[in-house]
């Protein structure tokens, strides 16, 4: 039970499900919109990456120390749990992004969730759900690649416009 819970939290939730929201915000950041929020999400992703790897290592150590739980049934249970997490994340994406918008193709983003989930499964020694799938959003990987030694407090202050400077802007421009 502990190994499954660690897998669910580290690989399904933090490792896959958080990426829907992160990707949407980072797509705005990529377009120079909401630079401060985008940078904060990049710092958050740096921390999430550490959590994902920590929980993956803990999971793998538990499996190594308790080989008797690493059965075909347990492996399939984990894969099906990931499949349910993917389904829920895709529903979230469809709700947040009902049409192609903010420089993001819904289909590419849904495919990205399959891609990232398969990476998490493979990292835990499990068979992917969508073998051979390619990363449809390579820019997202680049956005997530933040220097580990970069410190929030040492970063440059991002400039913001006053709301009065946006007067006359339509929602489509934002």
Model features per residue range: what roles?
Residues 1-174:
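Non-heme di-metal
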């Amino acid at each position: 039970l502990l190994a499954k819970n660690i897998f669910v939290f580290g690989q399904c939730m933090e490792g896959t499900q958080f990426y829907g929201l992160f990707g949407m915000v980072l797509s705005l950041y990529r377009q120079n919109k909401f630079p401060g929020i985008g940078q904060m999400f990049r710092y958050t992703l740096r921390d999430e990456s550490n959590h994902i790897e920590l929980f993956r290592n803990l999971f793998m150590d538990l499996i190594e120390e308790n080989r008797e739980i690493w059965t075909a049934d347990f492996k399939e249970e984990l894969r099906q749990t990931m499949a349910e997490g993917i389904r829920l994340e895709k529903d979230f994406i469809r709700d947040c992004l009902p049409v192609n918008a903010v420089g993001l193709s819904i289909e590419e983003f849904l495919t990205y969730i399959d891609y990232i989930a398969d990476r998490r499964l493979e990292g835990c020694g499990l068979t992917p759900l969508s073998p051979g799938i390619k990363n449809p959003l390579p820019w997202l990987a680049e956005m997530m690649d933040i220097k580990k030694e970069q410190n929030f407090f040492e970063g440059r202050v991002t400039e913001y416009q006053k709301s009065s400077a946006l007067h006359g802007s339509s929602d489509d421009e934002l």
